[in-house]
Amino acid sequence: MIGLADCNNFYCSCERVFRPDLVGKPVVVLSNNDGCIIARSEEAKALGYKMGDPFYQVKEKLEAEGVAIFSSNYTLYGSLSNRVMSMLSHYSPHIDQYSIDESFFEVDYSMAKSFFETDHSMAERFFKEYPKENVTSATADSLLHQYGARISADVLQAVGLPISIGIAETKTLAKIGSKFAKKYKGYQGCCLIDTDERRRKALSLFPVEDVWGIGRQIARKLDYMGIRTAAQFADKKESWVRSHFNITTVRTWKELNGESCISIEELPQKKSICTSRSFADEGITDKNVIEEAVANFAVRCTEKLRRQGSVCQGITVFAWTSRFNESVPEYTIHDSLTLPIATNAQDEIVGAALTILRARYPKPMADSRPDRPGMSFNFKKAGVILWQISPDNPRQQDLFDPIDRSKQKALMEAIDAINRKNGYGTIRQAIQGTDCQFDLKREYMSKRFTTNINEILKVKTQ
């Protein structure tokens, strides 16, 4: 069986962990530069706020209705995500993190039975008083449900984040189960789809456009064909599905019918890695600051690259001015290069990114100030994309490579270890700067309670 643990309204729930006064109250989280709404609590959804609502359009309404507003605090979210994933690893030997707030895991009856017999839940390590289930006579299905419900309760107790768990024969069905567990409290945090009867009932109640793997275009095509529920799609013959859709959709159809086509390890590596940012206010006009920003984006990309055990050979850099401000000239930078040898070393990738940027950066305009060359262009967004990604081991070697790759790899591992322990940017390249002049506009950001000693939560006692 495959389980999926999905954190409920993750960003909003993270903000509530250190603000218990917000439990039961509407909360929204904003995108980079406080641009639009990207996360909503259930209470905020009930008030009618939508994903992507521009903040400037709903700001007054949010304030009038007493909605708690937060800027994105990715440091906090990443830290709490790591805690959840660490806890999940104690309940299953095979964990496959799908996103910051979702993770697949393997589960079976013997695993659940062994867990309850030893009764070694993570929550009990931190809390002396914790209810113990009597499962000596539990059937296989009820035991699996209790196991999932226990994981959900333990994570809430120890980390403070509510999670919903779906358990089924396939990843796609587990996804559907987690949606039901999130929507209906009667499931106690876990929905088990382990029989054909339960599968068919779940699919009959689930919109086909919400099925994992069914995109908007395919959903529109299915709707045109009169297929609105997952059950209607699953009931079609395989030959019909193959004649109308691609192999990916056929795999989704098989998964809905209980045939596992996506194993725990099979989720593909990213074909490209991108780090980009929109700049606040009027943008950036200083070439040195743009270079600093691009260097930081390149470093972030290399960290992601090393984290998934990959190397890349292609690099793209882009930057552009505002398309909506007619008072300043428009300019776009977008160029790529291919490295002779695939790498994940940040010094090589940062150097290549800066080479692209400097080659395409606009020359000073005739009417620009002599002491601030190139200041007539206000760049509103920039980013770095890594492509031609392949596994780090094995990697294609070059007989005449002047770099000692073993020493380079050891250096990158040391830098990553130090930065993980002491915080991002503890060791950085000089070109990255120290004052983040290109930093995001985050007027509503909460503190980094779990990673910054100066922002740790203080509790007053009498």
Predicted regions: what they are:
Residues P162-S164, T316, K381-G383:
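Residues at or immediately flanking beta-strands
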Residues A174, N325-P329, D392-P394:
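Short acidic/His/Gly/Ser-rich catalytic and metal-binding motifs that mark active-site loops
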Residues F10, N33-C36, S322-N325, I389-D392:
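Short, charged/polar surface micro-motifs in flexible loops or helix N-caps
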Residues M1-N257, I264, R405-Q462:
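Gly/Gly-Pro- and Ser/Thr-rich, intrinsically disordered tail segments characteristic of DNA damage-repair
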Residues R40-E42, P329-D335, R395-F400:
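Short acidic, glycine/proline-rich loop/turn micro-motifs
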Residues D210, I218-D367, D371-S376:
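DNA-contacting surface of Y-family translesion DNA polymerases
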Residues T338-Q462:
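Acidic, metal-coordinating catalytic segment for phosphate/diphosphate chemistry
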Residues Y98-E102, A168-K171, S310-G314, F377-K381:
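Short Gly/Ser/Thr- and Asp/Glu-enriched loop/turn motifs at secondary-structure junctions
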